[in-house]
Amino acid sequence: MIKPLSEQYVSFLHDESRLTGEAADISFPQTVGEVKTVVAQCLALKVPITVQGARTGICGGAVPRRGHLMNLSEMNKPLNVLKGNDGAFYLTVQPGYLLSSLRRDLRTRRFEWLDPALVDPAALAAFSQAPEQFWPPDPSELTASIGGIASTNSRGPGAFKYGSADNFIAALQVVTNDAEEHEIKDDRDLLEAFIGGEGMLGVITALTLRLQSKPSEMWGIGFFFNDENKAAGFMDQAVAAGLPALAALDFLDAVSLTLAGELKQVAAKLREIPETPPEARAAVYIELHGDSEGEIEIAAQELMEAAETFGSDPDTSWALSGDETEKLRLFRHAVPEAVNTRLDQIRLDYPGAVKMGGDLTWPGISFAESLAHYRRDIEKSELTAVIFGHARDNHLHVNLLPRNEAERQRAADLMAAWLDHSRELNGRLFREHGVGKIKSELFLNHEQPREIQSWRELKDRLDPDGLWNPGNMFQEVVE
């Protein structure tokens, strides 16, 4: 069950962050029993365990520092469908179950792998006859595992309307330091500690997801602007409109559009997407969700008129509905993919290059003010940067791409200043990507002291020997 970390497994030593680690051995458990066996063997010998899902993280949280690497990709099935007293449906899944599989199975309602010992036939029958369900967090990275999404409390494009994953996770099964499985359901504080805990407290072996009826109307709209400041003004007006149907409101700067366009030339999945207007300096991506076509049409018309007042040409806008909106999501998701491709190119000349990506919020000020602040700092620093992200709480992902050691230091200083500004505004310093190993120093130097202390106390209580995912959040000290 536990295998030496030989050459055939070296790809498991890194994730999308491009950080590479090391481990002595690896396992691919398929059952809870196998997880418990591996955990018992490792902890008895004080061997650290790094828990890993689909390796789509960008902060190195699933990259091992040493010890044992437990990959959960073989625990990839749905287990049970329930109907709650609230009338909602709940789906219990294994942690390695991919978001793409969840979306497919909810669409087709074919759950061949459900455990017959668990399933209530009446609940399954009701589910098969109910309107199509969906899981609202729905991050844009379809190859992410549900366990991984939970471990960073990730959000999708629809976070403007639905919030984070923890709003739609009702219960967890976890194996902890006693090598036994425990259910966490009623203790919401403990549940939310594991959701977003980055594998530092134990291994998630099952998750119960709260589903919701899929809106019958789902529209995707893209507006293009020749001036990013006008795009920012439109973002603020769209937020102020308070439209109930507004599910996603994202910003992409000129570099984002250029990089996504370059990726479009070589990625088959993007070829059906129209070309962006050559003069565009920014874009705003919108999703509208609702059950009334009339409501969606009114919201779309209001947004289109507002965009036009800020200089967006309606003839260049994109508008798709239903399953076609996935094309726009693919374009939006192409931006971080393209950033990683550009980082790989930089590494040819600067092997130590690491992307410094912001994942913080600046609440209480306008989106336009936030964007202007970032842009002013970037221009002063003369760094290469890509800006994209969400309107809610001005949650922008500012990616800095240093090309040499001097730029790396300037990027680190700039990121530190932005984190401090977020703290001054009572924002979130690490919102949806986690801290992992890449941002642990930033976490310790800039997070609110009470937040650091809370995590430290929890870690000491549930993992006193520091054997679960060492190096995440807290810098590991090896004696």
What residues fall within each predicted segment?
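Activity-critical C-terminal alpha-helical subdomain
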Residues: 439-479
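Short acidic/histidine-rich active-site segments
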Residues: 390, 428-435, 470-473
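N-terminal flexible segment immediately upstream of the FAD-binding catalytic core
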Residues: 1-40, 56-89, 105-108, 256-263, ...
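N-terminal accessory segments
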Residues: 1-25, 41, 45-49, 54, ...
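C-terminal substrate-recognition/cap domain of FAD-linked oxidoreductases
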Residues: 4-12, 224, 232-413, 417, ...
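Short beta-strand elements
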Residues: 74, 170-174, 192-196, 202-211, ...
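FAD-binding subdomain of flavoenzyme oxidoreductases
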Residues: 78-81, 92-250
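Flexible, low-complexity linker/loop segments at domain and module junctions
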Residues: 211-218, 275-280, 479
